[in-house]
């Protein structure tokens, strides 16, 4: 079957920064260019900074949160999330139009496996309206302005908040 490219669908030049080969391969399949990065979260953010002007859209995948969840290593998973939190000011300094933080699935350390639990989504743009969420977690996201959305709705929302849609809705 023909697989459409992100450029054809959304008109964006897209880059991927990912340690895990499967994500790089899938990204290539949909027309994204792989940006070389080292193995650490800091390395991935450095690669993002260095290549920021070359792309309209980035997918940055942090694998260790998933790996630690599968191992049942709550502390390890927590430390990786804290590492991402420490690196976020570097992303904010680049002044992107939209930032999305989410996961491709839940991997609770207590389950030691991928699970059926909903995945929290944080979407930020200067066009976002304030909501009642006070943090970013599975529980706190129920107070967020996005509500419960399907994954297929995320890219059009991102494009809308980046002011890159010709029209939203019917």
Q: What name fits each language-model region?
A:
Residues 1-170:
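Feature captures the catalytic ectodomains and active-site-proximal regions of enzymes
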